[in-house]
């Protein structure tokens, strides 16, 4: 394969592609720009961090919503723990939010984008 540029963060997923059951520690971070529509007056950036057990997502840096799911108890993500967080959920959300803030911006890009491509 190609050598990644030194400026690119991350690590190869090749071991997981070869063996999906291989040990993997760490987190996965994703971002998605949700365009304005009937429900949203303006675009909002969503960003997520996923550990082996948890997925934390905030929309518009938390101003447009927050989600927390415990994949050990709720692998299909039916119960958003951020809606009524207990002490453990509050602690997890704070820890994951801090990690996420270091890696991904919650701001909507200022450059023009084509919503039809989303």
Protein language model annotation of sequence segments:
Residues 1-5, 82-86:
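Short, polar/flexible loop-turn hinges at active-site or ligand-entry regions and domain interfaces
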Residues 24, 87-91:
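Cytochrome P450 catalytic domain signature, combining two hallmark sequence patches
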Residues 60, 80-82:
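Short clusters of small/polar residues that mark proteolytic maturation junctions
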Residues 74:
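Intrinsically disordered, low-complexity polar regions and short flexible loop motifs
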């Amino acid at each position: 394969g190609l050598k990644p540029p030194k400026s690119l963060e991350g690590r190869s997923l090749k071991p997981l592609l070869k063996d999906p059951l291989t040990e993997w520690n760490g987190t996965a971070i994703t971002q998605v720009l949700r365009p304005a529509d009937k429900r949203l007056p303006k675009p909002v950036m969503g960003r997520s961090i996923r550990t082996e057990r948890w997925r934390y997502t905030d929309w518009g840096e938390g101003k447009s919503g927050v989600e927390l799911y415990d994949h050990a108890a709720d692998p299909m993500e039916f119960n958003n723990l951020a809606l009524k967080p207990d002490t453990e959920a509050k602690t997890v959300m704070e820890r994951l939010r801090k990690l996420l803030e270091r890696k991904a911006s919650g701001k909507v890009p200022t450059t023009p984008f084509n919503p039809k491509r989303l």
